[in-house]
């Protein structure tokens, strides 16, 4: 009798994706982040569902409903902080996952990579709308500033902003629709993640060497299931430590003040994981230019496969490209720091230089260095 997991229509799909999947024998812990992102998404959907049971998307009661969740609902404080800090963990895993893809040349799987870029945009949109929901000062002003950027679009800009707002300012209509979108988007993200996996399993995983691993495959279960469980346990350890010891470490104190349209906070800044993009936005004095740079800072990832000039896929054996990669990482950390600083000297010039370096590295220096390394192979 054939095993049920190989014959049952539904089990067959699960089996070919998570049990009998042929995987390269040499993939490192950098390949754990895909499964960690899946765990993060499940945690976010579950905690979000329980929060939505008690939350009210009305400007008069939104702030107090969040307070009610933290004070009166059984373990409401835990659910709320798991959701808020879970988002931070989600983005940390996302950035490490993308970084892994850049370093080891996983972007050569075009369909998988492009769906990944789309997923990144979807997750960023979801996180932005979620940040608006508690209706604190930073929620309100963050929503006002970021939605206002669309007014930079020529001709249709101002109409578009008012259409998104549902009025002449960020108000009840905006909050209600943001809640609706924030609720539906994670399910769209889950569907996209399924497509992401579908495309990945068409080609099989990449590996650190960047070479074809067809000659040396091992089954996903038990080898990588055990490895993934270790990653999940570490993720849970970090998340619970953050939630139970310093839940407000990554938050903004201004968001504990109810939204007040008549009082602007001294420094409007987004959540920790958006600061690098915010720094790029602020470093360009022109509004439209800033918006384009903001979008391009993520969209540039979609161009990377076409800028691959190296004869080798991975950076494992390319020391010069490795140097540039780590300079890019340092540059992103610099941008993150700048995004949280006030707009004054010397932060303005540092932000501008870091923004120029970011695009220069990806679009110019890395492809040229790859060509140089190709020539070194001839020696």
UniProtKB/Swiss-Prot annotation:
Heme b b566 binds at residues 97, 196. Keywords: Electron transport, Heme, Iron, Membrane, Metal-binding, Mitochondrion, Mitochondrion inner membrane, Respiratory chain, Transmembrane, Transmembrane helix, Transport, Ubiquinone. It comes from the Eukaryota. The cytochrome bc1 complex contains 11 subunits: 3 respiratory subunits (MT-CYB, CYC1 and UQCRFS1), 2 core proteins (UQCRC1 and UQCRC2) and 6 low-molecular weight proteins (UQCRH/QCR6, UQCRB/QCR7, UQCRQ/QCR8, UQCR10/QCR9, UQCR11/QCR10 and a cleavage product of UQCRFS1). This cytochrome bc1 complex then forms a dimer. Component of the ubiquinol-cytochrome c reductase complex (complex III or cytochrome b-c1 complex) that is part of the mitochondrial respiratory chain. The b-c1 complex mediates electron transfer from ubiquinol to cytochrome c. Contributes to the generation of a proton gradient across the mitochondrial membrane that is then used for ATP synthesis. Heme 1 (or BL or b562) is low-potential and absorbs at about 562 nm, and heme 2 (or BH or b566) is high-potential and absorbs at about 566 nm. This is Cytochrome b. It comes from Sorex monticolus.
């Amino acid at each position: 009798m054939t095993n049920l997991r190989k014959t049952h229509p539904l089990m067959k799909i699960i089996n070919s994706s998570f049990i009998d999947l042929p995987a390269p024998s040499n993939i490192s812990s950098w390949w754990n982040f895909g499964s960690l992102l899946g765990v993060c998404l499940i945690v976010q959907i579950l905690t979000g569902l329980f929060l939505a049971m008690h939350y009210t998307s009305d400007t008069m009661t939104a702030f107090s409903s969040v307070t009610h969740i933290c004070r009166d609902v059984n373990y409401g404080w835990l659910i709320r902080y798991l959701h808020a800090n879970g988002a931070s963990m989600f983005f940390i895993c996302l950035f490490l996952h993308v970084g892994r893809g850049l370093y080891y040349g996983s972007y050569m799987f075009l369909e998988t990579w492009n769906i990944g870029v789309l997923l990144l945009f979807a997750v960023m949109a979801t996180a932005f709308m979620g940040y608006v929901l508690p209706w604190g000062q930073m929620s309100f002003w963050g929503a006002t500033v970021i939605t206002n950027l669309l007014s930079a679009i020529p001709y249709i800009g101002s109409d578009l902003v008012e259409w998104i707002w549902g009025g002449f300012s960020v108000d009840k209509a905006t909050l209600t629709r943001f809640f609706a979108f924030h609720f539906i988007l994670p399910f769209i993200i889950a569907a996209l993640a399924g497509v992401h996996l579908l495309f990945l399993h068409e080609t099989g995983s990449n590996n650190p060497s960047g070479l074809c691993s067809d000659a040396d495959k091992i089954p996903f279960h038990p080898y990588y299931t055990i490895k993934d469980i270790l990653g999940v346990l570490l993720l849970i350890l970090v998340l619970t430590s953050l939630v139970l010891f310093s839940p407000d470490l990554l938050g903004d104190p201004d968001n504990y003040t109810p939204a007040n349209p008549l009082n602007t906070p001294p420094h409007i800044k987004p959540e920790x994981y958006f600061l690098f993009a915010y720094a790029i936005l602020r470093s360009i004095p022109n509004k439209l230019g800033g918006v384009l740079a903001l979008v391009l800072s993520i969209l540039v990832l979609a161009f990377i496969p076409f800028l691959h000039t190296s004869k080798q896929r991975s950076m494992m054996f390319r020391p010069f490209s490795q140097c540039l990669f780590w300079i890019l990482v340092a540059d992103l950390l610099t941008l993150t720091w700048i995004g949280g600083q006030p707009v004054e000297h010397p932060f303005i010039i540092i932000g501008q230089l870091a923004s120029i370096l970011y695009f220069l590295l990806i679009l110019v220096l890395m492809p040229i260095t790859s060509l140089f390394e190709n020539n070194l192979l001839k020696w």
